[in-house]
Amino acid sequence: PSSTLPRSSAASDVYKRQLLLMFSITLAQSEDLTKLGTFKDWNAVSVFNETGKICFAYSVPVRQSPKASNREARLFVSFRPEDKITDEVSITSGYDFNPQNAILATSGKSKFEFDLPQNKFAWISSGKTEQKIIKRMKKASRLMITAYKQSGTQTTDDYSLMGFTKAYNAAKKSCT
């Protein structure tokens, strides 16, 4: 991705916290979102905040394990033109991640690590890896996220990728 700040910098971490808060608020106040479209199992939306326009494609899991969990899991690809950020892949599993365990995305034989966990969200630090996972998401039908709660309990979120490419393209177009 294009970024003026390294993803692991303190300034980037502060921005991510602000983005998390802003995203939580905007989801709670859905009238602030502009829906760009629903594409099978994916949605594309945009929102304006004090730093400018943010666009993202997102989906919810089609299956979760353990089954009884009422988590607010989501998979996102975001675009923030004011910050020169494109193709930012992130997840939330609805709980604070255990930093001792890897957060992995698996699709077929391809594996990708979300190596920047922060509270309930996690990001991929490498723009090259983000490009690889997006390329895989455009071709594949499923993506499985495996992560661990603070207690050590493993969770699995299974995402359908049906509609991803169209949602991705709509979000990207809206923010370019």
Give a label for each model feature:
Residues 1-18:
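Single conserved hydrophobic/aromatic residue that forms the stacking wall/gate
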Residues 8, 28-29:
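Extended interaction regions within the primary functional domain
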Residues 23-27:
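N-terminal signal peptide c-region/cleavage motif recognized by signal peptidases
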Residues 29-176:
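A generic "folded-domain core" signal
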